[in-house]
Amino acid sequence: MDLIVNSIIETISYNNYLPKRFKITRLKTISGNIHAVIVDIKDEQSEMLVALSVLEDKNKYRIIK
């Protein structure tokens, strides 16, 4: 999965929940591992730091644009 800054990703939901959309704002390196800072499209005030390997899991996230 090619992740770049300002990409929009969506959680894959197997239940009847609406999927959430996130925007990648920046990439960080922590202890030699690359992490992405993502924000919810509807709430850009809160940020989450997620390991890049989690975002590359095609069972959890997919790239929208």
Residue ranges and their predicted role:
Residues I41-K65:
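Intrinsically disordered, low-complexity, charged/polar segments
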Residues R26-S31, K42:
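A generic structural motif
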Residues G32-V37:
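Short aromatic-glycine-enriched beta-strand elements
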Residues L18-K28:
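Short beta-strand-centered aromatic/proline hotspots
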Residues M1-Y17:
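Short coil-to-beta transition motif at edge beta-strands of beta-rich domains
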